[in-house]
Amino acid sequence: MAGPEGFQYRALYPFRRERPEDLELLPGDVLVVSRAALQALGVAEGGERCPQSVGWMPGLNERTRQRGDFPGTYVEFLGPVALARPGPRPRGPRPLPARPRDGAPEPGLTLPDLPEQFSPPDVAPPLLVKLVEAIERTGLDSESHYRPELPAPRTDWSLSDVDQWDTAALADGIKSFLLALPAPLVTPEASAEARRALREAAGPVGPALEPPTLPLHRALTLRFLLQHLGRVASRAPALGPAVRALGATFGPLLLRAPPPPSSPPPGGAPDGSEPSPDFPALLVEKLLQEHLEEQEVAPPALPPKPPKAKPASTVLANGGSPPSLQDAEWYWGDISREEVNEKLRDTPDGTFLVRDASSKIQGEYTLTLRKGGNNKLIKVFHRDGHYGFSEPLTFCSVVDLINHYRHESLAQYNAKLDTRLLYPVSKYQQDQIVKEDSVEAVGAQLKVYHQQYQDKSREYDQLYEEYTRTSQELQMKRTAIEAFNETIKIFEEQGQTQEKCSKEYLERFRREGNEKEMQRILLNSERLKSRIAEIHESRTKLEQQLRAQASDNREIDKRMNSLKPDLMQLRKIRDQYLVWLTQKGARQKKINEWLGIKNETEDQYALMEDEDDLPHHEERTWYVGKINRTQAEEMLSGKRDGTFLIRESSQRGCYACSVVVDGDTKHCVIYRTATGFGFAEPYNLYGSLKELVLHYQHASLVQHNDALTVTLAHPVRAPGPGPPPAAR
């Protein structure tokens, strides 16, 4: 067989490991087999196209980066590939499994769909809850909880003896549950939305996997599973590798994407739109990272100790009425999680506020507490007129509950929350950072803070680039070490075989007196040993380099983390100064000068003497109602920079601004809050969309996003300048 150095095959069916040398397969996995390996099996030229006739084939699974044997009856031929792979290890004859029948169900019991398994207010299917509780009781310190290998299909889901299962069996049970669902947990439609959000990197991916994009029962189950995986990752010695490993394991289980069509070879999509085979793992990794950034505190396994003393009567000493929840300074009502994040940004541990729960169930609230530099979300439950964080619910009102934990540590509710509710974020009294009392003085100080913020941002960006580069180099070194290990293993096996054969030949040549052949055999043996020693030495040097570079990488990460609080504080101060100047009527041109932003004067409306003549006053020129992102991009296609429209957002109660920047269409969420419309706190100040549009007609969006160096200059439906003479 001559020609290419290897061949690619794609798995059509799942295959579970039967022997240590076997490969686990998922549908769509790409396998690489070297030409030398097929030659060693006696495969004639052209025989590689019929893998079912080859039998067991040795190769590399591109998804798991593992080597081993797989049945040719489970794969299809894709095409040649210019990759050199080590030859196969010798192995004895072995019967080949029959090719699964097309359309035949995977052995095992298929579970009912999720709406048939549970209903809100339950947060997840009882089977999954039972498995997760069992595995968390065994402890979350093991790094080997979840491996990428496929579990055996289950035929019994009674779980009657689950308390006797070991950790590996429980982990397989959770993976089996996901595979036993009649359809993947993440639907293809939701997967497409998540892929677009991940590709555009315009914000968190999580909202793309919430209702209505992802059906309610699937969204609840996914959220429950991510909370569990977040706890597993947070207990690992190194968070980053743990998150990547969990993504690689659960990505294919959650999406169960079918293999791409076999006509184009892998990587050969002409338009570049073919989804990456790594997308499922990357998606789960991103979701876990978002979850860990704002970790939701789960209720404890056991109910908290009862309060030391029953809360006193809520009647005031002067005979007045007890304070109501609406009057509490720390209760903010129906505000979004993003607004809460902004209010708690850069605050000390123990800072808190309460808002309405996102479930919109009457009587349920969410306490957000700052702890360890992160926001902890704690659900306030309500039943029969009583409130609490978990059973038993002993407080007569939310006010009583919060007042109790202002004096008692939350550690009695959750051991990790060893703090009290110390600093309420008051809706009546917001901190005033601006100390200067004149517009010029405030503007001068804004310039100083903005310069400090830019300097810190540049330093952080440089560190981030260095961290990304070294992380990639570390991964390449780890891959090289794995290759060294595999090469050493092959050479040592070859050495053992050679040593066994050499003894027989040496004895034979000694009897024959053939000194020349004896010397040749001994020389070959010494050369092989020398080569193995060289590879060992190279691997040792690479491991030393890896340890040194990993240490440097950790130092860069520490420096980045030390910069984050400074960046957040400087941005908060800068934003307060911008809001103060805006409220005092400072002209945007002057603000832009303080910020170092060039004032654009070339748009067609810049020279209008009377602002009342602007087409922005006519909502019909820019408000287009309920259209989606794709339709908005079509309307703005080919338009000049600054052309914009306002539409309804897919987020309930919000709007979206689509604007052309550097020839591309960008999308920004417009929030509607109690204080007004705006792109972000503390800028939600505008009483209507029209007021917002008129302000940003001359104010750059760059203050919200460094990539949006544009104003809302040209309403999409406004009459524009005439075409050039050549086009008339």
From Swiss-Prot:
Regions of compositional bias (Pro residues) in chain numbering: 87-98, 257-268
Molecular function terms, GO-annotated: 1-phosphatidylinositol-3-kinase regulator activity; phosphatidylinositol 3-kinase regulatory subunit binding; phosphotyrosine residue binding; protein heterodimerization activity; protein phosphatase binding; receptor tyrosine kinase binding
Region: Disordered, residue numbers: 81-117, 254-279, 295-320
Stretches assigned to the SH3 domain: 4-80
Matching InterPro entries: PI3K_P85_iSH2, PI3K_p85beta_SH3, PI3kinase_P85_cSH2, PI3kinase_P85_nSH2, Rho_GTPase_activation_prot, RhoGAP_dom, SH2, SH2_dom_sf
Processing after translation: Phosphorylated in response to signaling from activated receptor-type protein kinases. Dephosphorylated by PTPRJ. Dephosphorylated at Tyr-655 by PTPN13. Phosphorylation of Tyr-655 impairs while its dephosphorylation promotes interaction with FBXL2 and SCF(FBXL2)-mediated polyubiquitination. Ubiquitinated. Polyubiquitination by the SCF(FBXL2) complex probably promotes proteasomal degradation of PIK3R2.
Keywords: Disease variant, GTPase activation, Phosphoprotein, Protein transport, Repeat, SH2 domain, SH3 domain, Stress response, Transport, Ubl conjugation
Swiss-Prot/TrEMBL site (Arginine finger) positions: 147
Single GO biological process annotation from the record: regulation of actin filament polymerization
GO cellular component: cytosol; focal adhesion; nucleus; phosphatidylinositol 3-kinase complex, class IA
Residue ranges occupied by any Rho-GAP domain in the UniProt entry: 109-295
Residues found modified as Phosphotyrosine: 464, 605, 655
Domain SH2 as annotated: residue spans: 330-425, 622-716
Keyword flag Lipid metabolism: no
Effect of residue 651 to A: Loss of interaction with FBXL2 and increased half-life
PANTHER family assigned: PHOSPHATIDYLINOSITOL 3-KINASE REGULATORY SUBUNIT (PTHR10155), PHOSPHATIDYLINOSITOL 3-KINASE REGULATORY SUBUNIT BETA (PTHR10155:SF1)
Description of how the protein assembles with itself and partners: Heterodimer of a regulatory subunit PIK3R2 and a p110 catalytic subunit (PIK3CA, PIK3CB or PIK3CD). Interacts with AXL. Interacts with FLT1 (tyrosine-phosphorylated) and FLT4 (tyrosine-phosphorylated). Interacts with NYAP1, NYAP2 and MYO16. Interacts with FBXL2; PIK3R2 is a substrate of the SCF(FBXL2) complex. Interacts with PTPN13; dephosphorylates PIK3R2. Interacts with XBP1 isoform 2; the interaction is direct and induces translocation of XBP1 isoform 2 into the nucleus in a ER stress- and/or insulin-dependent but PI3K-independent manner.
Family: Belongs to the PI3K p85 subunit family.
Stated role: Regulatory subunit of phosphoinositide-3-kinase (PI3K), a kinase that phosphorylates PtdIns(4,5)P2 (Phosphatidylinositol 4,5-bisphosphate) to generate phosphatidylinositol 3,4,5-trisphosphate (PIP3). PIP3 plays a key role by recruiting PH domain-containing proteins to the membrane, including AKT1 and PDPK1, activating signaling cascades involved in cell growth, survival, proliferation, motility and morphology.
Disease involvement: Megalencephaly-polymicrogyria-polydactyly-hydrocephalus syndrome 1: A syndrome characterized by megalencephaly, hydrocephalus, and polymicrogyria; polydactyly may also be seen. There is considerable phenotypic similarity between this disorder and the megalencephaly-capillary malformation syndrome.
Domain comment (free text): The SH2 2 domain is required for interaction with FBXL2 and PTPN13.
Protein name stated in the entry: Phosphatidylinositol 3-kinase regulatory subunit beta
